[in-house]
């Protein structure tokens, strides 16, 4: 009877990231990942459905998290303030301890069209979940969709900037900078009446 090896998941993740970076995602096989980690292919499949899941594991829960962050924001906050509240909460829990893994992950995804598509699908799911949560707060559908798209974009820009800086500043500080820039671009005011169309 086999026994579970301590740290197997982390070893598989590290081996996969190293191989993806060395050889490219498409040229790396599951048996190679398992061998690099000193484990069996069977052990790999106990932890991951396929090699893509090394990069995307746990992300199925992100839309629910996005919706909860919007729903849990104080009721008095407008959409831009809700975005700030949610991104501050995320920044508080994303630590710099795995920044190098996140940088490698980004490089691997950027180098593969299929992975980039998967990443875009993830962001679309986040925006959809956030838009539904904004509508549930009573935000009209157009503003809800825009707020959700802005939230996802602000998150993407902040994380990219943080990774580009190799974690020289904390993510919370970068988020604050991005939110300041966002507020300088978009005024947090009620939507004006649409202009009449020319006859």
Feature map (PLM): residue ranges:
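Hydrophobic alpha-helical connector segments
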Residues: 64-107
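Hydrophobic alpha-helical bundle segments that form small-molecule/ligand-binding pockets
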Residues: 123-148
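C-terminal peripheral helix-coil segments that are non-catalytic and often amphipathic
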Residues: 132-135, 167-199
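Amphipathic C-terminal alpha-helical segment
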Residues: 148-168, 184-191
């Amino acid at each position: 009877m086999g026994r579970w090896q301590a740290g197997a998941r982390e070893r598989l993740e590290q081996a996969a990231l190293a191989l993806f970076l060395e050889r490219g995602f498409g040229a790396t096989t599951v048996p190679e990942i398992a061998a690099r980690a000193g484990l069996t292919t069977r052990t790999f499949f106990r932890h991951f459905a396929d090699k893509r899941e090394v990069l995307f594991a746990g992300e199925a829960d992100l839309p629910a998290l996005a919706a909860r962050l919007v729903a849990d924001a104080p009721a008095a906050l407008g959409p831009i303030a809700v975005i700030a509240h949610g991104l501050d909460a995320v920044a508080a829990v994303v630590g710099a301890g795995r920044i190098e893994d996140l940088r490698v992950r980004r490089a691997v995804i950027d180098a593969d069209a299929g992975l980039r598509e998967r990443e875009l699908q993830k962001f679309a799911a986040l925006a959809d979940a956030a838009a539904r949560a904004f509508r549930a707060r009573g935000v009209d559908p157009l503003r809800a969709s825009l707020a959700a798209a802005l939230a996802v974009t602000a998150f993407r820009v902040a994380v990219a900037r943080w990774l580009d800086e190799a974690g020289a500043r904390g993510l919370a500080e970068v988020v604050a900078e991005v939110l300041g820039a966002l507020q300088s671009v978009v005024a947090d005011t009620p939507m004006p009446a649409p202009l009449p169309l020319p006859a």
